Swiss-Prot record:
The lineage of its organism: Eukaryota, Fungi, Dikarya, Ascomycota, Saccharomycotina. It catalyses: guanosine(46) in tRNA + S-adenosyl-L-methionine = N(7)-methylguanosine(46) in tRNA + S-adenosyl-L-homocysteine. This is tRNA (guanine-N(7)-)-methyltransferase. NCBIfam families: tRNA (guanosine(46)-N7)-methyltransferase TrmB. Belongs to the class I-like SAM-binding methyltransferase superfamily. TrmB family. It comes from Yarrowia lipolytica (strain CLIB 122 / E 150) (Yeast). Its EC number is 2.1.1.33. Transmembrane segments: none annotated. Forms a complex with TRM82. Keywords: Methyltransferase, Nucleus, RNA-binding, S-adenosyl-L-methionine, Transferase, tRNA processing, tRNA-binding. Residues 1-54 are annotated as: Disordered. Its main location: nucleus.
Amino acid sequence: MLKRDQSEMDIEAETANMGKEEKESFVHKRQKYRQEQEEKRLAAKKGVSFEQPEDGEIKLPKKRYYRQRAHSNPFSDHQLEYPESPADMDWDVLYPNRKEGQKVEVADIGCGFGGLLVALSPQLPNQLILGMEIRVQVTNYVEDRIVALRHQNKETDGYQNISVLRGNAMKFLPNFFEKGQLSKIFFCFPDPHFKQRKHKARIVTTTLCSEYAYVVRPGGIVYTITDVKDLHEWMVKHLAAHPLFERLTKEEEDADPCVATMLVETEEGKKVARNEGDKFVACFRRKENPEW
């Protein structure tokens, strides 16, 4: 039996209640929309102009044209591009206005549709913020969202400090970031992987905690939030057990403006709030390196 392409299954789910003509019309519109957005995205990356609407305004992307499943298998071969080392990464492609020598300091792992990135941009105006997302269409949506926001705020150079790339942080994080490069790293509503045999695919594990300790500088913060209590306890257990992390006190968390932003600005967080669900937060500080 042939394995169907993910996009085919997404289309079936989206058009399940549509008639034949309505379904064909929707598929055609989505293909045309995605093609137009891809052309704009490539043009923006190359720094060349592209045809704009008559009113000169680049509109924010429409989420319905970027449908994709909620999660992706991090162990699958996703044919990702990644640098051999951080020194090989061309950050100017993602941040055209960055200052010479300026490096990414904040990472949102599994950034979803970019709500936290957009909220953090004006909050941390002097820091480069990167979202990493493994799903193709979700990454494309965030790229298009940033292109539109930059265009809409070009007079003030708004949103020049955020960007997104498609990548697998569980495999290639040290390929992008140097030792101690990050001051903040966010894990917002990650895949809970409920089944015990899937726990190895969780974004916080004993092995991965060591990688996070490598890329986060002493004094830097690891932010976690989830609506799944079991996952919250799992992340707390593994981070607390690592010798290079210590948990922030409740008072320290309450005083951190990034925690307040994380609680309300992600798309998943807003969904949890609408459903009156719980949100579990835990933040950990990177300890100083031991003296050998």
